[in-house]
Amino acid sequence: MIIDTTKVQQAINSFSRSESLKEVYGLIWLLVPIFTPLLGIIIGVLVIVWLERQISAGVQQRIGPEYAGPLGILQALADGTKLLFKEDLLPSRGDILLFSLGPSIAVISILLSYSVIPFGYHLVLADLSIGVFLWIAISSIAPIGLLMSGYGSNNKYSFLGGLRAAAQSISYEIPLTPCVLSISLLSNSSSTVDIVEAQSKYGFWGWNLWRQPIGFMVFLISSLAECERLPFDLPEAEEELVAGYQTEYSGIKFGLFYVASYLNLLVSSLFVTVLYLGGWNLSIPYIFIFIPELFRINEVCGIFGMTIGIFITLAKAYLFLFISITTRWTLPRMRMDQLLNLGWKFLLPISLGNLLLTTSFQLLSL
């Protein structure tokens, strides 16, 4: 039997011109901007886990992971695969609906925060005029998932851990908000893209780090507390609460809490970069003027400039990650009363005073 290649080619061409194939292409190009950042975020979390293991090994003067891949870089992937195949146990007298929804709410609410983060020039999922406040609103949902997990477990340790997570989030979300308000006042915008571009004019000296040093320190401490990292990991203190709200969990649901923790750490690092460290911009004054010109030359130059922006953003974010990981293995855990006193009696008055000073200077400069 001889195949007529001409007819086959005609059939392929007619299929490629069909409306159904155009709809498939449209759907693919619609999903690409969504799944590309998602893949990047997952890779970023894997790198954070590897970095934490290596840094903790160095601090404790021991050898870190070295068997799963070169230099142990696949260790996090191996741990996730192990948890994926473990049995998913459910508490016999717990609320199964709340128990199952808790980890999902914690992860999804943090993933939504990435939609307003500019990774580079023209590289943001949603450039909203209320970008930073949307992040604050969305990040307030995650403790609800932790509280649901603790309550649905029907375990006293889990419930206490959920209550601690909610109390800690409220205590440090409030001082963090005036710091963001101060940055919005300086930039005359609440858009994350506008905030980055407002820091671009004078290069390194235009960063909000130098104009808001007090706000930067308050934001840094509040971000660590929001991520529940040592010395602020009271909701899952092993010596007091076994594992806190995670006590009754196993399998992939248990792994989701760790994913949420590292996702939150990465998003906090990126917001420190965007708000205080100039985002995707280099430390060269007026360099931002030439970035749009790269896109006008040709697409290759534009993609090259965008890649450099992504690299700069991640380099600054991983600097904050290094500080937070080192802090975890350096400082001891605080008591619950010390944690609340630090948030309500120390950080909140300082952040409000910083906001008052910023508002006064902005009014005087009009």
Curated annotation (Swiss-Prot):
Instruction: Enumerate the GO terms in the molecular function aspect.
Output: NADH dehydrogenase activity; oxidoreductase activity, acting on NAD(P)H, quinone or similar compound as acceptor; quinone binding
Q: What is this protein for, i.e. what is its function?
A: NDH shuttles electrons from NAD(P)H:plastoquinone, via FMN and iron-sulfur (Fe-S) centers, to quinones in the photosynthetic chain and possibly in a chloroplast respiratory chain. The immediate electron acceptor for the enzyme in this species is believed to be plastoquinone. Couples the redox reaction to proton translocation, and thus conserves the redox energy in a proton gradient.
Q: What is its main location?
A: plastid
Protein origin, superkingdom = Eukaryota
The record describes its membrane topology as: Multi-pass membrane protein
Name the NCBIfam families on file: PRK06076.1-2
Enzyme nomenclature, EC number: 7.1.1.-
Instruction: Indicate what this protein is called per its UniProt record.
Output: NAD(P)H-quinone oxidoreductase subunit 1, chloroplastic
Q: How does it assemble?
A: NDH is composed of at least 16 different subunits, 5 of which are encoded in the nucleus.
What family does the Swiss-Prot or TrEMBL record give for this protein?
Belongs to the complex I subunit 1 family.
A Pfam match: NADHdh
Task: Give the transmembrane ranges.
Answer: 28-48, 105-125, 128-148, 250-270, 271-291, 303-323, 346-366
Question: Which InterPro entries would you find in this protein's record?
Answer: NADH_UbQ_OxRdtase_su1/FPO, NADH_UbQ_OxRdtase_su1_CS
Protein location: Plastid, Chloroplast thylakoid membrane
Keywords annotated in UniProt: Chloroplast, Membrane, NAD, NADP, Plastid, Plastoquinone, Quinone, Thylakoid, Translocase, Transmembrane, Transmembrane helix
GO BP annotations of the record are: aerobic respiration; photosynthesis, light reaction
The reaction(s) catalysed by this protein are: a plastoquinone + NADH + (n+1) H(+)(in) = a plastoquinol + NAD(+) + n H(+)(out); a plastoquinone + NADPH + (n+1) H(+)(in) = a plastoquinol + NADP(+) + n H(+)(out)
**GO CC field:** chloroplast thylakoid membrane
